[in-house]
Amino acid sequence: MSRIRSALALVALGLSAVAGHAQTSPAISTIVAFSLSNPVGNLVQGADGALYGVGRPATSIPGAVIYRAALDGSDVRTLYQLKPDDALSPAGGLVLASDGLLYGTTKFGQAGQIDSAGSIFKIAAAGTGFQIIHRFAPVTASNQDLNPINTNGAYPEAELVEGADGYLYGVARAGGPNGTGTIFKISRDGTDFKLLHSFAAVTSSTTSGLTVTVDGAAPTGPLVASTDNFFYGTTSQGGANGRGVVFRIAFDGTGFQVLHEFSA
C-alpha cells in the first residue's frame, strides 16, 4: 500500500473466526483518506453512529480541526477549525459525555502565549457551540528535567473520561508543583476544576537519562474507570527505575497507590 503523506486513513477491520478458536488475519480497508496532518487520539462514535476525531498541523500553528466521518466514508466534514484565540494542538481524542457533547484537550493555549499549558474544550456533534471551558495555569518555572511547573498541570495529552458523577477526569503530562504531571477532574461546564494528585518531584535520573520519582511521572494515557470505584492509569516515566508505573486512585481523589513499577 502506498504511503499517504499528511493524510488520515480511517480503517475497518474484518475479523473471521475459524474452528479451533483460530483467527484469520484482519482484513484492512481504507474507507476514507483526506489531507490532514497528524491525526491524534482515538476516534469516538457519536449517537448518530458517525466517527468523530481531531487532527492538528505538523507544527504548533493554528489550523487544527475537529471532524466527523460516516462509517462507510461517504460523508466526511470539518466541524470546527480551531482559531489562534482558541488553542493549539489537540492532544487526545474526544469523549462523548452524557450531555451529548464532545469534550477534548489541547496541549497548548492561545497562539503567541509562550507560558501556555493547554486547555479543555467542548463542542456539539453538529459542530456548534465550541467553547474553551478551562485553561491550565500559566507556566511559571521548570524543574531539573526542564519540564514546566505551574499550579494545576500542563500539556494534557490523553482523552478525558466521564465519571459516574458527571465530572470529566484526566491527566496532564507535565506541570503541577513538581513539573511531573497531575491528575484532575472538572465539571462539564468548567466551573469546578479540582486537582486530585500531583506526581512527586524528581529525585534523580538514571544513567540513560530517565526520570526517577517515587510515584511516577509524565502520564500520557487515559484513565480507566473500574467497577471497584478506582481509576487506573500509567505514567511513561518515573518510578524507581524511571520506566513508568501503573497506578490507581479512588474516584474521590483519595487512595493514590502505585501498583507496579516497570523494570530497567
Regions found by a protein language model. Give the residues of each.
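Extracellular beta-propeller repeat domains
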Residues: 2-264
